[in-house]
């Protein structure tokens, strides 16, 4: 994909994840159409922006709009439940990104899970990376408690509709926080309810310029 498609959002490489038809990682979609939706201020609308999709900020930089910002080296193997693409060219030069290969893997057997891996190489580390995940549900962060258990570093829970509980594991070096987007536009709230939450997983300022992040999303059942 690339960031100059019809009705474009800056979201090359993003995904959605549902568990048993229940939304977990979501794409907010588009709000009520206004003049801004179709003019030069389009990308000031939050739902059009990279950082409100399931994508990273690389070295502090988000994906911009433009046909030159695109993925490359796309690969899909249905027999292995795997899809990957290099997002480096979807980010601006100031990101210093030489490689950012995102891989999605499905594990339908046993405990169903989705694993998202970002393997990267930067020219230099100038700012933290921040991985974003937009979720429908409340979030229990590391250090929080759920049903009497305190969550360790590198683990959070997403409490979804219909009592579904989903676990996300991630590198313990990433600092987790949550932002709440109140949905005042009825076109959003009619689909998602009163709010969505964005999980932010930030690397240390001095994180290596080469490495990988792995995120695993696993169903824990309904509780």
Language model: regions and residue ranges:
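Extended polysaccharide-engagement surfaces of secreted carbohydrate-active enzymes
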Residues: 1-223
């Amino acid at each position: 994909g690339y960031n100059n498609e019809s009705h474009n959002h800056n979201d090359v490489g993003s995904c959605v994840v549902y568990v048993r038809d229940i939304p977990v990682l979501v794409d907010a979609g588009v709000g009520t159409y206004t003049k801004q939706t179709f003019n030069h201020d389009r990308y000031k609308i939050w739902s059009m922006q990279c950082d409100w999709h399931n994508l990273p900020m690389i070295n502090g930089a988000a994906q911009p709009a433009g046909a030159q910002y695109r993925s490359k080296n796309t690969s899909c193997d249905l027999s292995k439940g795997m899809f990957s693409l290099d997002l480096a060219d979807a980010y601006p030069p100031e990101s210093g990104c030489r490689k950012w290969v995102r891989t999605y893997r499905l594990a339908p057997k046993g405990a169903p899970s989705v694993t998202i891996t970002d393997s990267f190489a930067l020219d230099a580390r100038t700012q933290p990376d921040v991985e974003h995940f937009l979720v429908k549900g409340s979030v229990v962060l590391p250090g929080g408690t759920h049903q009497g258990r305190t969550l360790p570093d590198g683990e959070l829970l997403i409490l979804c509709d219909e009592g579904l509980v989903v676990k996300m594991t991630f590198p313990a070096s990433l600092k987790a926080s949550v932002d709440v987007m109140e949905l005042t536009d009825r076109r959003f709230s009619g689909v998602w309810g009163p709010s969505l939450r964005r999980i932010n997983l930030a690397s240390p300022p001095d994180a290596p310029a080469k490495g990988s992040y792995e995120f695993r999303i696993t169903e824990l059942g309904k509780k």
